[in-house]
A protein has these predicted regions:
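Conserved, structured core segments of small domains
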Residues: 1-96
Length: 96
């Protein structure tokens, strides 16, 4: 299922991860693990934020993806089902 991964890192945890060099490595490993089709980085509500879109093959993959973010960055992590324009078109057509 196409899924948007939202990762938010507090300023304190992000600063610590930048200083110790772990932030780029955790982000790299996460993007490799999910094989993201797209990833964007911004600030939302004063927190470093990443949005990555990927195919979540099984719900049992969630701990493998989320735990390094929880443990390494004290991040808030959300998995949000999403669709592209073509998938929306297909879904709306099924309504009749």
């Amino acid at each position: 299922m196409r899924t948007m991964l939202k990762v938010q890192i507090s300023a304190e945890a992000g600063n610590r991860a930048i200083k110790d060099g772990s932030l780029p490595e955790i982000i790299r490993k996460t993007l490799e693990a999910v094989q993201a089709e797209a990833a964007y980085f911004t600030a939302v509500d004063g927190k470093r934020t990443m949005f990555a879109v990927f195919d979540l093959k099984a719900s049992s993959d969630i701990p493998r993806i989320a735990e390094p973010l929880f443990m390494g960055l004290n991040a808030a992590v959300e998995f949000i089902p999403c669709m592209n324009a073509e998938e929306l078109k297909t879904g709306l057509a099924a309504l009749g």
